[in-house]
Amino acid sequence: GGEVRVFGTSPREAGTSRRIGVLIEAPGLYGTMSAYDNMMLKALALGLVDPKAKVRDLLEFTGLGQVGKKKTKQFSMGMKQRLGLALALLGDPDLLLLDEPLNGLDPEGAREIRRLIMQLNDQRGITVVISSHVLEQLGKMATRYGVIREGHMVRELTAADVDQECSDFLQVEAANPTLALAVLQERFPNLRFQSMPDASIRVFGAADAGAVGATLNEQGIAVQGLYAHKRDLEEFFVEMMGAEYRG
């Protein structure tokens, strides 16, 4: 079993849930009502007193201040997501939970949602937790990653950790990988090395392919393969999850 704690306490504690805003993948909207009316209805449910100014502020913040009486069923996917974000912000949350906020959006819509999310953190101090499989988009805004498999957090990484894991590297395939690794570590102490399950060696840190190959040849170690590679975020996570399944 496990335990969930939010703000240092149980999420069931009185008042805790009011500090959390939530946007599910497809926000629940009343299609025959305007954005403003949807917001006012949510404000009423939250018990907010005289929420008109707050509603207008949030609609302006999310770029919906000029949509007027247009019914939300006529909104684009991006507009619906922005309204869902505004609804989630009505209670002035300290923590915002977003489930696939970029799913189904065109590049312009995704960029706009991403900009809003980053503004919420930078300008309003709101912590944003995003559940998503759109790794390319996450890589443009995340500062910390948590990898969940079968309900368990299997690894946490900072953005710096991920950048390092996804940095350029040389892939070295040698006849004697154990000896090759020892030779390279001694010759290039400032580089980082990783032994792979397929017996290849990855060399990180702006390694010179010619120097690496020459060093191994000088020691009589046959080089069977040597090439530069760039691992993107998706490849890194797929490899990591594969390792977790094997491990």
Report each predicted region and the residues it spans.
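Hydrophobic side chains in well-ordered alpha-helices
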Residues: 16, 180-184, 212
